[in-house]
UniProtKB/Swiss-Prot annotation:
List of residues binding Mg(2+): E254
EC number: 6.1.1.20
Cofactors (names): Mg(2+)
Protein name: Phenylalanine--tRNA ligase alpha subunit
Upper classification of the organism: Bacteria, Pseudomonadati, Pseudomonadota, Betaproteobacteria, Neisseriales
Molecular function GO labels: ATP binding; magnesium ion binding; phenylalanine-tRNA ligase activity; tRNA binding
Length: 330
């Protein structure tokens, strides 16, 4: 018995003195391993009488339990010390100044779109939307561009399945709106992405347009000039901005015109196209051209963004260069 008590006392003392997990595991192996001291005592029980075996065996098991309890307590203490050391090493210094997150910003083309919509909304125009994949009727035929019409050669079009196309302009939105509206007055602005096979410093295969439409009794070309001139002067915040309407041709308007503004270099700069809605277009959407007239215009939002922010290469808007885009943070 005394020998058992001595061995377990030495083992518990060694456990309590252990400084790390490796030392602790070595002590456990020395006392409870296959060849450990307490394990060896159990092997001697076979040499004892039944009465001694019962008494001494129970005592040895009790000592093993005491050793295991001491071992578990020391292991938990080492784990706690390790955790506290880690927390101390990773502690946050709440006296340090905070690091502010950089705020995001809207894309310059989006800012331009918002400005255009805001200005036309103030004139009583509402925003209309439509699908980017269009059928032949809405993208061409309803706009007075029938099959084999020479004007189709003006459009380098992306065709998809079943003869559908990626819309080449936002004019199909106007067609859909008038077909749904059934009866004028119609006064809408139709912004969105459009697609044409073109790519250089001033053109992109995907770009953004905004088209306006006003159909009502008594609408004239003078109304078109007044509305667009007021818009573009307010957009560029220049009341003295010179605007001219130059005769042109579009199959969906008659008469048609290109819109130019005077640049800072003293040269005219084209910024859009417009005209009075062609009678055939009105007929295609079940509106009586004898009773109603209307005008339509279209502008390139990317081009307006280039002019507004003095950007020379359209492709910069789509390169996702943060150094470039951060310039437009409000």
């Amino acid at each position: 018995m005394e020998n058992v008590n001595r061995i377990v006392a030495e083992g518990i003392a060694a456990v309590e003195a252990a400084q790390d997990f490796n030392a602790l595991e070595q002590i456990k192996a020395r006392y409870l391993g296959k060849t450990g001291e307490l394990t060896g005592l159990l092997k001697t029980l076979g040499q004892m009488s039944p009465e001694e075996r019962k008494t001494i065996g129970a005592h040895i098991n009790e000592c093993k339990n005491r050793f295991q309890t001491a071992f578990n307590a020391k292991r938990d203490a080492l784990n706690e010390a390790k955790l506290q050391a880690r927390l101390a090493a990773e502690a946050l210094d709440i006296t340090l100044p905070g690091r502010a997150q950089e705020g995001g910003s809207l894309h310059p083309v989006t800012l331009t779109l918002q400005r255009v919509v805001e200005l036309f909304h103030g004139m009583g125009f509402e925003v209309a939307d439509g699908p980017e994949i269009e059928d032949d009727f809405h993208n061409f035929q309803a706009l007075n561009i029938p099959a084999n019409h020479p004007a189709r050669a003006m459009q380098d079009t992306f065709y998809v399945e079943n003869g559908d196309v990626l819309r080449t302009h936002t004019s199909p939105i106007q067609i859909r709106y008038m077909l749904d509206k059934k009866e004028p007055p119609v006064r809408i602005i139709a912004p969105g992405r459009v697609y044409r096979v073109d790519s250089d410093a001033t053109h992109s295969p995907m770009f953004h347009q905004a088209e306006g439409l006003w159909v009502e009794e008594g609408v004239t070309f003078a109304d078109l000039k007044a509305v667009f001139t007021d818009f573009i002067r307010r957009f560029f915040e220049r009341d003295d901005l010179q605007v001219r309407f130059r005769p042109s041709f579009f199959p969906f308007t008659e008469p048609s015109a290109e819109i130019d503004i005077m640049g800072e270099n003293g040269k005219w700069l084209e910024v859009g196209g417009c005209g009075m809605v062609h009678p055939n277009v009105l007929k295609n959407v079940n509106i009586d051209p004898e009773k109603y007239t209307g005008f339509a215009f279209g502008i390139g939002l990317d081009r307006f963004a280039m002019l507004r922010y003095n950007v020379n290469d359209l492709r910069l808007f789509f390169d996702n260069d943060l150094n470039f885009l951060k310039q437009f943070v409000k």
